[in-house]
C-alpha cells in the first residue's frame, strides 16, 4: 500500500529515478493505493539530460509494491521495492522501455502498451 509521502523508484527509461507520492487519486478521501492504481508524484532525483526534471509534478502508475497483490488462485506476489512508471497528464506512458517484472493483472484496455514495453511478465 502506497500512501502520501512515500518514496518510490521509477522503473522505466523516462529519466526520473526517485519520486515521492503527493496524492492518491480516484477517491475523495482515499488514503492508500495498490498495484495498478494511479497516483500524483513529484520527481526528487532525475537523470542529467532527460525530459523529466527535478520537482516536476506528474502522474504515475504503481507496478510493484512491497505489500504485493493476491490472485484469485490464492497466491500472494510481493516485491522487494515500490516502483512506478511515469505518465503524462493525459495518462499515457512517457517511456519506451519498462525495467523489471510486470504483473499480468496490469493488462487492461487503457494500458495495453505496458505489457509490450516490458520483457518479464508474471
UniProtKB/Swiss-Prot annotation:
It comes from the Bacteria. Keywords: Ribonucleoprotein, Ribosomal protein, RNA-binding, rRNA-binding. One of its GO terms (molecular function) is large ribosomal subunit rRNA binding. Disulfide bonds: none annotated. Part of the 50S ribosomal subunit. Forms a cluster with proteins L3 and L19. In the 70S ribosome, L14 and L19 interact and together make contacts with the 16S rRNA in bridges B5 and B8. One of its GO terms (biological process) is translation. Pfam families: Ribosomal_L14 (PF00238). This is Large ribosomal subunit protein uL14. It comes from Carsonella ruddii (strain PV). The gene is rplN. Binds to 23S rRNA. Forms part of two intersubunit bridges in the 70S ribosome. Belongs to the universal ribosomal protein uL14 family.
Amino acid at each position: 500500500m502506497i500512501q502520501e509521502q512515500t518514496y518510490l523508484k521509477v522503473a522505466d527509461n523516462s529519466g526520473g529515478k526517485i519520486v515521492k507520492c503527493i496524492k492518491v487519486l480516484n477517491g475523495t478521501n482515499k488514503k492508500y493505493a495498490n498495484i495498478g492504481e494511479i497516483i500524483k508524484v513529484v520527481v526528487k532525483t532525475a537523470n542529467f539530460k532527460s525530459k523529466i526534471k527535478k520537482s516536476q509534478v506528474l502522474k504515475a502508475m504503481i507496478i510493484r509494491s512491497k505489500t504485493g497483490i493476491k490472485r484469485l488462485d490464492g497466491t500472494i506476489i510481493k516485491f522487494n521495492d515500490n516502483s512506478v512508471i511515469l505518465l503524462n497528464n493525459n495518462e499515457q506512458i512517457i517511456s519506451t522501455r519498462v525495467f523489471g517484472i510486470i504483473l499480468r493483472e496490469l493488462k487492461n484496455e487503457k494500458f495495453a502498451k505496458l505489457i509490450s514495453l516490458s520483457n518479464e511478465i508474471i
